[in-house]
């Protein structure tokens, strides 16, 4: 059985790690390189580094920061934010990233998914989907882009299936309704996507307790859980989370 993964997320704006609630009201959470090293040392299975201002400000992710961060850790590392071309992906992979995350650019140009998958292998291509529930529509979600600022009107489940067909190797699925709230993952959203694709789904948005993380694996059928404010605020440690999940008999790489 493939081990379930715990993945700290470093949302970066203007060179600093930030975290907000529902994609707004951002607060400073520290230096990205320092936090990357800390989480790597504490037993993270992977890291995700997202330049959350890049797609809004129409600039590329800072390759220098990626390079410094990647050189400081020994675990797989995903980079996202403002990546809109095969050449940009190449630059980031050469700078030390193991994977790249595409979001707005993939919606705007779906061919980028297939082109990059053919060029670098689908194991390198993560598609980030920012999902928000439709008003008064249970079990229906729409895809948002531009850092959650623009509603595309695209159905999340249809888009998830399409990106898999185009060559995505993984889906990073964020519940905008749960982001930063620490009120629990959107299990209905996560399970709905996991049930219609055969590629791993990383659940994001809402982790607030040990039980939340257990539930997203057990009920949500996620392959990985993204963790941000829960760790940044030192509410829980990776060791505590892994110990709890191992006691629950989940397939987790032990804390070392």
Curated annotation (Swiss-Prot):
Catalytic activity: 5-[(5-phospho-1-deoxy-D-ribulos-1-ylimino)methylamino]-1-(5-phospho-beta-D-ribosyl)imidazole-4-carboxamide + L-glutamine = D-erythro-1-(imidazol-4-yl)glycerol 3-phosphate + 5-amino-1-(5-phospho-beta-D-ribosyl)imidazole-4-carboxamide + L-glutamate + H(+)
Location(s), subcellular: Cytoplasm
Record's keyword terms, sorted: Amino-acid biosynthesis, Cytoplasm, Histidine biosynthesis, Lyase
HAMAP family: HisF
Gene: hisF
Sections of the chain in a coiled coil: none
Record-given protein name: Imidazole glycerol phosphate synthase subunit HisF
GO molecular function: imidazoleglycerol-phosphate synthase activity; lyase activity
């Amino acid at each position: 059985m493939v081990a379930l993964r715990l993945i700290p997320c470093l949302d970066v704006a203007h060179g600093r790690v930030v975290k907000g609630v529902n994609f707004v009201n951002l607060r400073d959470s520290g230096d990205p390189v320092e936090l990357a090293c800390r989480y790597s040392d504490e037993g993270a299975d992977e890291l995700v580094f997202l330049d959350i201002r890049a797609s809004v400000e129409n600039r590329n992710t800072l390759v220098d920061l990626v390079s410094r961060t990647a050189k400081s850790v020994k675990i797989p590392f995903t980079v996202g934010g403002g990546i809109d071309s095969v050449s940009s992906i190449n630059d980031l992979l050469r700078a030390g990233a193991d994977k790249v995350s595409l979001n707005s650019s993939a919606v705007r140009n779906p061919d980028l998914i297939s082109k990059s998958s053919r060029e670098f292998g689908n194991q390198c291509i993560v598609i980030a989907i920012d999902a928000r529930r439709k008003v008064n529509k249970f079990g229906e979600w729409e895809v948002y882009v531009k850092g959650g600022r623009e509603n595309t009107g695209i159905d999340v489940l249809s888009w998830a299936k399409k990106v898999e067909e185009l060559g995505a190797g993984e889906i990073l699925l964020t519940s905008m309704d749960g982001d930063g709230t620490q009120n629990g993952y959107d299990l209905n959203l996560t399970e709905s996507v996991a049930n219609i694709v055969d590629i791993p789904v990383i659940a994001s948005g809402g982790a607030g307790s040990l039980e939340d993380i257990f539930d997203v694996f057990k009920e949500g059928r996620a392959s990985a859980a993204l963790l941000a404010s829960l760790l940044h605020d030192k509410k829980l440690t990776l060791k505590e989370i892994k110990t709890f999940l191992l006691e629950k008999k989940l397939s987790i790489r032990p804390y070392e």
